[in-house]
């Protein structure tokens, strides 16, 4: 009877963690390449969302904005209330500019530093859709757009192959299901999600990954102890 109670309690704890605290995430596709790759397994936390929205640079899990059964994984680029512009040039490099207030000819905003975007892909980034414009929800490329309150502008790191706010529009805060903080598969890439900062999310992820790291060390010691001594 005691074993049954323990099993039920453990199952209830796991359910509560998945429902309100953390969730596993399977990366499908290459829209977040090179930082995240196809079939990577991640841990996303939900706790920080109860105390406010995500921060710029966070990798978020969002509800599919189109007919799809799978969640989307994107990076937060623009925050609620900000002005954003993706500036094309002769090389089609989509530099992103952000401003807290309505930009003028004298205040052109600040260009974002995006180290998570691969230099190889950055040289080929299209500013918008194939037709040279944003979706009907947003004006043409190179124009400033105002992000409504409680909405976010999200994009994939692999800008050439990502369906994101450039095509489906702003992402409401209510559609954000979690913040990806750590990768636990493959094991040789175990660690924090690229671009993540030391925040509450990282502390939570570190605590989650600690048993896995200990298991890897223990297995390494076990394998080394099985080796035969070198001949003298």
Predicted regions and their residues:
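Soluble "head" domains of membrane/secretory-pathway proteins
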Residues: 3-6, 11, 17-26, 32-232
């Amino acid at each position: 009877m005691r074993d049954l109670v323990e099993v039920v309690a453990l199952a209830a704890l796991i359910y509560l963690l998945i429902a309100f605290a953390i969730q596993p995430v399977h990366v499908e596709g290459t829209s977040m390449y090179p930082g995240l790759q196809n079939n990577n397994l991640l841990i996303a936390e939900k706790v920080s969302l109860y105390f406010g929205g995500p921060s710029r640079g966070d990798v978020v899990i969002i509800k599919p904005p189109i007919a799809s059964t799978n969640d989307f994984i994107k990076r937060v680029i623009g925050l609620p209330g900000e002005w954003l512009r993706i500036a094309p040039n002769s090389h089609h490099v989509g530099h992103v500019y952000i401003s807290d207030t309505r930009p003028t000819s004298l205040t052109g905003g600040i260009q974002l530093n995006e180290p998570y975007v691969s230099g190889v892909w950055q040289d080929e980034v299209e500013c918008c859709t194939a037709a040279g414009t944003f979706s009907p929800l947003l004006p043409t490329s190179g124009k400033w757009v105002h992000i409504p309150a409680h909405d976010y502008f999200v994009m994939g790191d692999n800008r050439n192959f990502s369906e994101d706010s450039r095509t489906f529009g702003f992402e409401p805060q209510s559609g954000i299901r979690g913040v990806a903080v750590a990768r636990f598969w493959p094991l040789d890439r175990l660690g924090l999600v690229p671009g993540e900062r030391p925040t509450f999310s990282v502390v939570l992820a570190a605590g989650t990954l600690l048993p896995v790291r200990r298991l890897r060390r223990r297995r390494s010691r076990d394998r080394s102890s099985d080796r035969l001594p070198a001949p003298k």
